[in-house]
Regions:
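RecA-like P-loop NTPase motor core of helicase/translocase proteins
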Residues: 1-177
Length: 177
């Protein structure tokens, strides 16, 4: 927590903001106007977190299927760019699909950087969601539900357009991840 707070204070000071004396949570907000490159900024941030701190599990949560597809398209378009900026950093990205539980298993067990894009509905609809159902295809050790595998990786969660995601990732969705 001290390292995180010091980094936060450095960013605050560089931007003429008063430094926070304590770190109240591990949740950070970056606000940018529409069309200013927010998707690129958070993708680049993921690569920097991987480079500097070895963080390798990232989940991008979006409010709709259309935005999910847009983020995926951006990942495709920027793939060569990020490979040239971060030479030698292998990574995989994919859309969460409840019909493909092997993707969740790969996310949890792979040693390369993982980027999963999912809608908030995939997290919040607990009653009908395969994310919360046991599956032999996702079992690792004593974890048999996809959500448990994801949670065990302690991923970095990026919420795209949190104002459009029913109350952000409050309640069940935030707790789940």
């Amino acid at each position: 927590d001290d390292v995180l707070r010091k980094n936060l204070n450095n960013v605050q000071l560089k931007n003429q903001l008063p430094p926070s004396p304590v770190l109240d949570s591990h949740d950070f907000t970056v606000e940018m106007e529409t069309g200013t490159g927010k998707t690129y900024v958070y993708l680049r941030t993921m690569f920097e977190l991987n480079k500097r701190y070895g963080m390798s599990k990232f989940i991008i949560v979006v409010p709709s299927v259309a935005i999910k597809e847009g983020v995926y398209k951006t990942l495709q378009i920027t793939e060569e760019h990020f490979k040239s900026l971060y030479a030698g950093v292998p990574y995989e990205y994919y859309l969460y699909d409840s019909a493909k539980p092997a993707d969740v298993r790969n996310f949890a067990t792979s040693s390369v950087m993982q980027i999963m894009v999912m809608t908030v509905g995939a997290i919040n609809k607990k009653d009908v969601n395969k994310l919360y159902q046991s599956s032999e295809k996702t079992t690792v050790d004593d974890l048999d539900k996809p959500i448990d595998l994801i949670r065990a990786t302690r991923p970095i969660i990026i919420v795209d357009e949190p104002q459009s995601v029913d109350g952000g990732l409050n309640g069940a969705g935030k707790t789940a991840l």
